[in-house]
Structures are given as structure tokens and as C-alpha cells.
UniProtKB/Swiss-Prot annotation:
It catalyses: a 1,2-diacyl-sn-glycero-3-phosphoethanolamine + S-adenosyl-L-methionine = a 1,2-diacyl-sn-glycero-3-phospho-N-methylethanolamine + S-adenosyl-L-homocysteine + H(+). Residues 34-54, 326-368 are annotated as: Disordered. One of its GO terms (cellular component) is endoplasmic reticulum membrane. It comes from Emericella nidulans (strain FGSC A4 / ATCC 38163 / CBS 112.46 / NRRL 194 / M139) (Aspergillus nidulans). It is a multi-pass membrane protein. It is an enzyme of class 2 (transferase). The chain crosses the membrane at residues 83-103, 107-127, 193-213, 221-241, 275-295, 298-318, 395-415, 417-437, 471-491, 504-524, 560-580. Pathway: Phospholipid metabolism; phosphatidylcholine biosynthesis. InterPro entries: Phopholipid_MeTrfase, Phosphatid-EA_MeTrfase_fun. This is Phosphatidylethanolamine N-methyltransferase. The keyword Aminoacyl-tRNA synthetase does not apply. Residues 344-368 have a biased composition (Polar residues).
Length: 965
């Protein structure tokens, strides 16, 4: 139901805070949940909508109605499932009536939490598995409940006729149960389950609120009127959000239809979806808090917060991954067709420039810095914390010092004054000081010029600026938190007054600011967060995605919600002064620093009204729209007046400052355990283990006996092999094909898993989880698709002579391939195990095989050939990228596919391989930044040259070695 996802694609326009983002970020178009409108191109002249199943089947999507109309409208036909839902709802109401007063609240709290769990956990689990494995459709396919009993293949004919009657009663036009695709019928049945859960969820919540409702003692009439008026207003607003959302998304997205099939229509971005991100999950829960107000119960408020948090978890864990997979796939890679084209592209400076060749390295070139450096080592986030970096170390030390002083000093008026003054000074520096530096950088590039004057590069100036801004931001908020700590007093009586409400609202505002900051960072990236367009004059390009789709300057209000949350929690006038100062200075920063630069950089392309403002303006009467324009004009004229005063006073202030400095100079010189359950099938009679076998095939590395000079005398002789079998040594990441044999009556749920040899002590039973590294031997017998990826051939009948008397008999054989996530991305010795009937009984074990990354041998670190490195590195990277033609390069200069930037697992595989091959350790961000094999090879060669003096290997430049014979 609650599809908290906006509809449509990005809209171009203009806004103040949306700074330019890097080119890579521009590729990541953040598309909210697509929905359809009646005006879309996917309808024919008769107004019919067409759907498309995953196998390409096109069908007419009949018109359906929302669940409230279906259940409660007398004009809508009723079926058995409607009566079941209405009966259960009536049972809830009857239960509230018969329960004693003392039992109503706990009983309905449990009932509501049960239905909420069914919603977020139950439906979430079903949708997650449907998205990844088509589980619901596979259940319907395996059970054959939608197959006509006349064919004799439906084991449940009565259930078939019941479902057919139930669905056809509801959908009278453009629908035939027999002809509708399996996916659509499955979705219709899933809808009935959703109707039951969602109606019971909301009904039990309302009944719980009724059970908890009370009239506070000594509450004035005015407060009662305000409380009920506000509550009713929130409920009505919630109702409008739901109705407008359903108008836009229809039943298709309301019931998660895109988990089952897609609509052949254009995407839209309309109505409430212009107002807020994920409106069904954000503002769509305003009614819960309105009901809490009317009930005047903290119990209702807290259970509303729990429900709201669970809904956001549902969004993050279920819906967002499905949306990214369905509507935001990585764009196709631009391929290099010929060597001539590759040379042409290199000469035209592509987005990721290729590293220089050996002959080019020593030629001095004038480097241009119009584009920002690639983001390799970001600053923000705990996952980017690096104690080797002075910015991070300084930030941690100053915060530790600040909070230590806060905790160890008493909260006397004198110390309170010092901490408040410290917070005010840091806020002034963060807004006025940083604003002045950015203004000078915008007008005359003063920050960059300073570093260029001392021989540094603009990239160094950019890095130093990021450190300065980051430390200033950290100290601004650390000092504010310290001041709030000093001014806060724990309530002596939590039940008196509005103490609990103040803390709940304050915590909510703080959470809102944190979410806003995270959303801004996700939209702008590291480059935009640190005002990169003040430093690099790349071609101006605005994007309006994420939170900027709805607001031009989210930090103007939402970005400072947390400071006002601190005011509510402390109930302190001093903290209110700090919050007011912070808000005024932030507004001034936007008006006098950001806005002039944005207008200069982007001009008329700036958007005047964001999505929220447009929605509000459309809902206002003409007289109020005119008043809004007049107010905007007054504010603009006021800002212009203040700017004129500052421009006039600037020379006088400068002269006064110079005099003050001159006089002053004269006076002063101067940082789980998992439980595995092995399932055993006791009935193994009738299966001949000699018919089971596993044979491993893959491209092999040349055998290397190793360096025997360290061994004893007897161990230095070459291995004496008695037989034709040799060691199996496979390259890192290469797909491994497994040929299996089994009796003809083998279970169709048999499966093959990949394990480290040392992980299992038993040869009869596997007691270690496969962790997803397994493939079924037959298709269609498991409720997910992942286990079937890799099946090549199944149940081919062949003859064999194995047996006691050597007689030939038939067995089944097949082939599967393990690749990608089904492999161990490390070195070691592994084996495959054939398991029986979906359990962990081992029927056959393959020969052990070794996965090895060959060490790159170079004669001299200083003469290391980049071409040789490229040649050795290319096949390894192709394996690391699953040999996927959409992302794996075919030549050293070909760019990686965009999925490498999104999914960090590919870069992690590469850096592990590079570390083992060359002894050089890189961060995964380096692989993504380099963008192709040639750049990475150049970086490896350069790193080897830099680290050669510190090498302790036998061939190290500073290590004396014996002369080679």
C-alpha cells in the first residue's frame, strides 16, 4: 500500500543550493519509484493499459479499485474474501467492547504490533523474495493452482474455481482468469492478502488509540481545542496525501505491481510526489501523530513512532533495492571498437584520462585543472575515517578535548558562559569566516592563488580547503553540543508538564537534521558538499535529484532542525539564542555567499520554485499567490539594502581594521558467531554412491614446484608422480565448470556446494554453511532463482560400466558452472560437494583444487615494464568483473562499466589480486577512480618505484643478494 516513492524522472530547472556534481555522479540518475498516469503513451485510443511480464508477454491490465471502496462501498460487488476481512475487522471491534478496561491497552498493543509485523516483516519478506527470486510466481507455478483442471495437471481444482470466482467478481471488464498471465493472477491473489493485513493494521491502531484516549487533568478549554484542531488537521492532511498518491500511482504501484510485471507507460512526477521524498512513508504518516494528539496518550505516540520507523526500514530494505534494480540500471558502457578508435579517444581527453606511456612520463606538460580531481579518499563518514590523515586525526583530537572539558568541568554559570561563547564564536567562524573565504575564492580565486604562489597545485589547494572546512564544521557542532550539555538539566519529574513531549519532539527534529544532511550529501557528493564549484570551473551543469527535487535549499529550514530540537530538549533561553544565531547566520551565508556564486555560475538555468513550492502555490487561491509574491519582493529588497550598506561600509571597516592591527602590533610582538544447522536425510536406501561423481574443469595455471632451495636434501628432488593426474591450479576468479553424475532416480532437489577443504572434517555430512556458493542440479525445484544461475545441462542419460560386475547401466549427468559471487575470492584449496535432496548428506566430493594468484616477477623495480603489467593484469581484472561484457574491459585502455562504480565488491576483488600479484596495497576507491587497466598499471609501476628503497624482498634495491648464476 504505502508506496513512499516519488514518480517519474528528474525535472530540469533552477535552485540555489544545488551545486554542480562530478561527472560520475551525473551518471547516477536517482529515479524514484515510477508510476503511471492516464495521459501516458502506454494506453490505446480506448484508454486501456498494457502490462508486460518478465518473459515479454503483453496483456491488457484491467481497471481495479482501491481496497476501501472494494470493502465498504455498497456499489462494489462483494466476494468471500471481502466478507472474511470485514468479519475479522468486526471481531476486532467486538473484542474492544468485551475486554475489561485494564486489558484493552496491552491486548490491542500486542494485536497492533502483530499486524504491523505482518505488514513490514511479512509482506516485506514476500516482496524481497519476489524481487530477487520470483518466489511468489514460482510458488504459483509449482503448485499449478492457476492451471485449468480440465488439463488434469491441477491438483487443487476446488481452489482453482474458488480463486477464479473471487477474482472475476471483482474485475468484470477486460479480464479473463484463464488467459491472464501467471504473474498478474499471482499479483491479484497477493493483493487480497495485502488488503487483509493493511485493513487490520489500521483498524487495530485506531482501536488501540481509542483504548488509550483520555482527557488530561487540568487541561484548559483552549488547549483542548488546539489539540483536537491540530489532530484533525493532521488526519485530514494524511487523508489528502493518501488520496492524491493513489490518484497518481493507481493500484499498480499501491500494491507493488512492479514486483510482478511492468506497465508500458511513461513515468510521471506529479502531485504529492513533488512535495516530499517518499510521501507515503514520510508525510503520509502525519495522521498517526494527529491521532496521538487527539488521544492525548504517550502510549499512542510511542507506538506511532515504532510503526513509522518500521515503515522506513521496509522502504530501505525492500523497496529501494527493488527500485534501483528495476528503474535505475547502470547505463551501457561506451565501447572501444578498434585500435584506431581507441587512439582517437585517448587523444580527445576522455572523462578518465589514460596514464602516460613510458616515453611520455618524463616530458613536462602544463597540466590543466579545470576539472575536479577524482574522488578517491573521501572525508565524510565513519567508513572513510583514516587516522593516517591529519584532518581526521585533528578532528578526533579536538573533539576529544572538547568533550573531555565538557564532562570534567562543573556546570556553573561561569563555565556555562564560556561554553556558550565558544559555541557562538565557532558558529560565527563557520558562517562568516568560511563565507568570507568562499566569497573571495568566488570573486578572485584567492584561496587557490595562495597555494599556487608557493608552487602548489590547485588540487593541493582543494585538499587543504576540504580539511579546513571539515574541521570548522566539526568544531561548530561539537562546541554547540557541548554548550547544550552544559545548559541541560535532567527533569526531576518526567510526568510533569510537557517534559516527555519536549524530548520526543526534540529527538525527532535532531533525526530530521541528520536525515537532511545525509540526503544532501547523497545528492551533492563530496565535491558539492565542500563547494567544489568555487574551485573548479568545469562546464556548469545543474542536476535536481534526491532532496533537491523538492527543495531548493533544504539546509535553510530542515538542515537546522536539530538546533531547534536542542532548544526543545533543554528548554533554555541561552540555547534558543544559539539556535537563532545559527539560523540567521546560515540564512545570511546562503543569501550573500551561495546565491551570488550560483547566479554567476549558472545564470538563468537556476530554478525559481522547487517541487514543494510549486505544489503549495497551485493549492493557494490567487489572492494568496499575489501576497506570496509581494513578500518575496520585500525580502529581496531587504537583502539588497543590506548588501548596499555592507558595500558602503567595507572601505571604512577595512581602514579601521588596518589601524587596529597596526596599533596592536606596536603593543604586542609577537577510530558473529553464526549457528549452522546441518539437515540430514535418513532415507538413503536405493542410491548407489558409485553412481555419484564430480569432475572439475577450468583454465589452469602452469604448474610451479616452487623454490626448493629452502628444503632439506631429500625434499629438493622433483615430485615423483605415480599416475596421470596432476594438481589442479586455477587462476583467481576464473569460472569453474563441474560435471556431475547421479543415479536416474536421484532427487531433483540435489545440489552442489563449494567449500574450503579445511572447513569440513566429515566426508559424509557437510556441517558448514555454503554462504550462497551453491547451484541446484535441476531447475524449478527451489523457490529462488539464484541457485539456478549456473545450470548448463541437467539429467542427460548416459551409460556407464561402473558396478560390481562391470555391467553397463544408465545414469544421469549434467553440468553446472560456478562464477561470480558463487566463488571464493581468495587463495586456497577448495572442493565441491554433491548433496542429496536439499539436505547436507554428501554423495560425492570432487578432487581438491587450488586457486592461486601468480606473483608478478620483475627483474628490476626501476625498469618495470608497464606493458607487461597491463598484460598480466587484464585477464585478472576480467575475472574480477565476472567476465561480464558490460563491465569487463577487453583492452587495457577500455573503460570499466558503470556498475564497478556502484558495487564495491568488484574493486575489492581487484585490490586483493593486485596486493598478491605485485605486493602493493591500494584502497578500492583507487580502482574505481582509475577507470581502466592502463591507469591502474601505471599506478602500480609508480608505486613499485616509490616503495623500492623500502622493499625487503630478495630483489629489493637496498638488500644485498648473491649474484645470480
Amino acid at each position: 500500500m504505502d508506496r513512499g516513492l516519488s514518480t517519474g524522472t528528474n525535472q530540469s530547472g533552477a535552485g540555489l543550493r544545488e551545486r554542480a556534481v562530478t561527472s560520475q555522479a551525473d551518471l547516477n540518475v536517482i529515479t524514484e519509484n515510477p508510476t503511471v498516469t492516464n495521459a501516458s503513451n502506454g494506453k490505446d485510443k480506448a484508454g486501456k493499459t498494457f502490462g508486460r511480464t518478465p518473459d515479454g508477454t503483453v496483456f491488457t491490465v484491467p481497471q481495479t479499485h482501491d481496497m476501501v471502496s472494494q470493502l465498504l462501498s455498497p456499489s462494489e460487488p462483494k466476494n468471500l474474501s471481502d466478507l472474511v476481512v470485514l468479519t475479522i475487522l468486526a471481531g476486532h471491534i467486538f473484542l474492544l467492547w468485551i475486554l475489561p478496561s485494564g486489558a484493552k491497552i496491552p491486548v490491542f498493543a500486542v494485536i497492533y504490533l502483530f499486524w504491523r509485523s505482518c505488514y513490514n516483516a511479512g509482506i516485506g519478506w514476500l516482496l524481497h523474495n519476489q524481487s530477487h527470486h520470483k518466489t511468489l510466481v514460482r510458488w504459483a507455478e509449482k503448485s499449478q493452482i492457476f492451471v485449468n483442471p480440465a488439463t488434469g495437471k491441477n491438483p487443487y481444482p476446488q481452489l482453482y474455481h474458488l480463486i477464479k470466482r473471487e477474482l472475476e467478481i471483482k474485475i468484470s471488464k477486460d479480464y479473463s482468469f484463464e488467459e491472464a498471465p501467471l504473474e498478474y493472477n499471482t499479483w491479484l491473489v497477493f493483493r487480497r492478502l495485502v488488503d487483509l493485513i493493511l485493513m487490520c493494521d489500521f483498524a487495530s491502531y485506531c482501536l488501540f488509540a481509542i483504548a488509550c484516549s483520555r482527557h488530561p487533568a487540568n487541561e484548559s478549554v483552549l488547549m483542548t481545542v488546539i489539540r483536537w484542531t491540530s489532530g484533525i488537521a493532521l488526519v485530514l492532511f494524511n487523508l489528502w496525501v493518501k488520496l492524491d498518491a493513489h490518484r497518481v500511482v493507481k493500484d499498480y504501484a499501491w500494491y507493488w505491481g512492479d514486483f510482478f510485471y511492468l506497465i508500458d507507460q511513461e513515468l510521471t512526477f506529479d502531485g504529492v510526489f513533488e512535495m516530499a521524498p517518499h510521501p507515503m512513508y514520510s508525510v503520509g504518516y502525519a495522521g498517526y501523530y494527529g491521532i496521538s494528539l487527539m488521544a492525548a496518550s504517550y502510549k499512542v505516540l510511542f507506538i506511532s513512532i515504532i510503526a513509522h520507523a518500521a515503515q522506513f526500514a521496509f522502504l530501505v530494505l525492500v523497496e529501494n533495492p527493488h527500485i534501483d534494480k528495476t528503474y535505475n540500471p547502470p547505463p551501457p558502457r561506451k565501447r572501444t571498437i578498434t585500435e584506431h578508435d581507441a587512439a582517437s579517444q585517448r587523444s580527445q581527453s576522455p572523462d578518465t584520462p589514460n596514464a602516460p606511456s613510458v616515453s611520455e612520463e618524463n616530458v613536462p606538460n602544463a597540466t590543466t585543472f579545470s576539472s575536479p580531481p577524482p574522488a578517491v579518499h573521501n572525508l565524510l563518514g565513519f567508513h572513510n575515517l583514516d587516522l593516517h590523515r591529519i584532518t581526521d586525526t585533528s578532528s578526533i583530537l579536538v573533539q576529544f578535548l572538547m568533550f573531555s572539558l565538557t564532562v570534567l568541568t562543573p556546570s556553573t554559570p561561569w563555565y556555562q558562559f564560556l561554553f556558550v561563547a565558544n559555541a557562538a564564536i565557532w558558529r560565527l567562524w563557520y558562517s562568516v569566516g568560511i563565507g568570507y573565504l568562499l566569497n573571495r575564492q568566488s570573486n578572485c580565486k584567492s584561496w587557490t592563488r595562495h597555494f599556487v604562489k608557493y608552487g602548489e597545485t590547485p588540487h593541493e589547494a582543494w585538499n587543504q580547503w576540504k580539511g579546513t572546512y571539515h574541521l570548522s564544521m566539526v568544531m561548530c557542532y561539537a562546541s554547540f553540543i557541548s554548550a547544550v550539555w552544559k545548559m541541560y538539566t535532567l527533569p526531576s519529574n518526567w510526568g510533569y508538564g510537557l517534559a516527555i513531549l519536549r524530548h520526543v519532539l526534540g529527538a525527532g527534529l535532531i533525526s530530521l537534521q541528520i536525515w537532511t544532511s545525509v540526503s544532501i550529501y547523497e545528492s551533492l557528493g563530496e565535491f558539492g558538499w565542500f563547494y567544489g564549484d568555487f574551485f573548479f570551473d568545469e562546464s556548469p551543469k545543474l542536476t535536481y535529484n534526491g532532496i533537491y527535487r523538492f527543495l531548493n535549499n533544504p539546509e535553510r529550514v530542515l538542515g537546522l532542525a536539530g538546533v531547534w530540537g536542542a532548544v526543545l530538549i533543554t528548554a533554555s533561553g541561552t540555547v534558543a539564542f544559539l539556535a537563532f544565531l545559527s539560523h540567521i547566520l546560515s540564512l545570511g551565508f546562503i543569501q550573500f555567499v551561495e546565491r551570488p556564486h550560483m547566479q554567476k555560475l549558472y545564470g538563468r538555468s537556476l530554478r525559481q520554485d522547487a517541487g514543494l513550492v510549486k505544489s503549495l502555490k497551485r493549492s493557494l487561491p490567487p489572492s494568496l499567490r499575489q501576497l506570496h509574491g509581494s513578500v518575496d519582493k520585500i525580502f529581496d529588497e531587504s537583502y539588497e539594502f543590506i548588501e548596499e550598506i555592507i558595500d558602503t561600509a567595507r572601505p571604512k571597516l577595512a581602514a579601521g581594521v588596518n589601524t587596529f592591527v597596526r596599533d596592536t602590533t606596536a603593543l604586542f610582538q609577537k577510530y558473529p558467531a553464526r549457528v549452522t544447522i546441518s539437515r540430514i536425510d535418513a532415507d538413503l536406501a536405493g542410491y548407489d554412491l558409485r553412481d555419484y561423481s564430480l569432475t572439475v574443469e577450468a583454465s589452469q595455471l602452469p604448474l610451479d614446484e616452487g623454490d626448493l632451495s629452502k628444503e632439506g636434501d631429500n625434499a629438493r628432488t622433483p615430485l615423483d608422480r605415480r599416475g596421470d593426474l596432476e594438481n589442479l591450479v586455477f587462476p583467481y576468479g576464473t569460472p569453474v565448470k563441474v560435471k556431475w553424475t547421479a543415479p536416474l532416480n536421484h532427487s531433483k532437489k540435489d545440489w552442489i556446494g563449494l567449500y574450503k577443504v579445511t572447513d569440513n572434517t566429515s566426508r559424509e555430512v557437510t556441517r558448514v554453511s555454503s554462504q550462497g556458493r551453491w547451484v541446484a542440479v535441476n531447475e524449478g525445484f527451489y523457490d529462488n532463482l539464484t541457485c539456478e544461475r549456473g545450470i548448463l545441462i541437467s539429467d542427460v542419460v548416459v551409460s556407464t560400466s561402473q558396478g560390481d560386475n562391470g555391467e553397463k547401466h544408465d545414469i544421469a549427468t549434467g553440468e553446472v558452472v560456478f562464477s561470480g559471487d558463487k566463488l571464493f575470492w581468495t587463495q586456497g584449496v577448495f572442493e565441491f560437494r554433491y548433496h542429496h535432496n536439499g539436505k547436507h548428506n554428501v554423495m560425492a566430493i570432487s578432487r581438491p583444487f587450488e586457486v592461486r594468484i601468480p606473483r608478478f616477477e620483475e627483474e628490476d623495480h626501476f625498469d618495470m615494464s608497464q606493458t607487461a603489467v597491463e598484460t598480466s593484469l587484464l585477464p585478472v581484472i576480467q575475472n574480477c568483473f565476472d567476465r561480464d561484457p558490460e563491465i569487463a574491459p577487453e583492452t587495457p585502455e577500455e573503460q570499466y562499466g558503470s556498475l564497478v562504480e556502484r558495487d564495491g565488491k568488484f574493486a575489492k576483488r581487484v585490490v586483493f589480486a593486485v596486493h598478491q600479484m605485485f605486493g602493493v596495497e591500494f584502497a578500492p576507491e583507487v580502482v574505481r577512480s582509475d577507470g581502466n587497466v592502463r591507469n591502474l598499471a601505471w599506478r602500480i609501476c609508480n608505486a613499485k618505484r616509490v616503495l623500492a628503497p623500502y622493499s625487503m624482498s630478495r630483489d629489493g634495491a637496498t638488500t644485498p643478494t648473491e649474484s645470480k648464476e
